[in-house]
Amino acid sequence: MAKYQTIEAAVRSEFGKGSARRARVAGQIPAVVYGADVESNLHVTIDHRTFAALVRQEGVNAVLELDIEGQKQLTMIKHIDQNVLTFHIDHLDLLAIKRGEKVEVDVPVIVEGEPAPGTMWVQDADTIKVEADVLSIPEEFTVSIEGLELGAQITAADIKLEGDTTLVEDPETLIVNIVLPAVEEEDTEEDEAAEEAATE
């Protein structure tokens, strides 16, 4: 991800639950910007529709430049506080960053393909932690399980990293495991139970 979007933000002059609620009603997301390059936490509001569109397009590891009333600040998403019922974004934590800086992020792992006939795959880890340049954070990693036989495994060490991205995750972290379908296991248990009953 070598590009980033610029989003306008306004400094918050009011605080508290009432102020945050009024901001959300007005279509704004209360947010806090923090980091080594920020002297003190900066409280701002961001347009909800614009930010939601950015996340849909760039993902949760998106880098964005805030235009805070004329002052530019490069940031990345650290936490999204989302309402579990409405999925509306209630609050944001944004980390102030600078070009050339490296950060640790959790990147989604996508599985593609089909394993050998008579088997199924189980994904044990949905993300892996890597260190990458702030302007080159991978959107996702893809692993292929095409034709893999029973017992085959894919670990974090098997994922191909590009550029200067490095693995932070334990290399032995299990990502995908090829196993027997659960139905077959249940059928085997039933057959064993039937055999035991027949011998009694």
Swiss-Prot record:
It comes from the Bacteria. GO terms for biological process: translation. NCBIfam families: bL25_bact_ctc, PRK05618.2-1. GO terms for molecular function: 5S rRNA binding; structural constituent of ribosome. It comes from Corynebacterium glutamicum (strain ATCC 13032 / DSM 20300 / JCM 1318 / BCRC 11384 / CCUG 27702 / LMG 3730 / NBRC 12168 / NCIMB 10025 / NRRL B-2784 / 534). CDD domains: Ribosomal_L25_TL5_CTC. Part of the 50S ribosomal subunit; part of the 5S rRNA/L5/L18/L25 subcomplex. Contacts the 5S rRNA. Binds to the 5S rRNA independently of L5 and L18. This is one of the proteins that binds to the 5S RNA in the ribosome where it forms part of the central protuberance. This is Large ribosomal subunit protein bL25. InterPro entries: Rbsml_bL25/Gln-tRNA_synth_N, Ribosomal_bL25/Gln-tRNA_synth, Ribosomal_bL25_b-dom, Ribosomal_bL25_C, Ribosomal_bL25_long, Ribosomal_L25_dom, Ribosomal_uL5_bac-type. Keywords: Ribonucleoprotein, Ribosomal protein, RNA-binding, rRNA-binding. Belongs to the bacterial ribosomal protein bL25 family. CTC subfamily. GO terms for cellular component: cytosolic large ribosomal subunit. The keyword Acetylation does not apply.
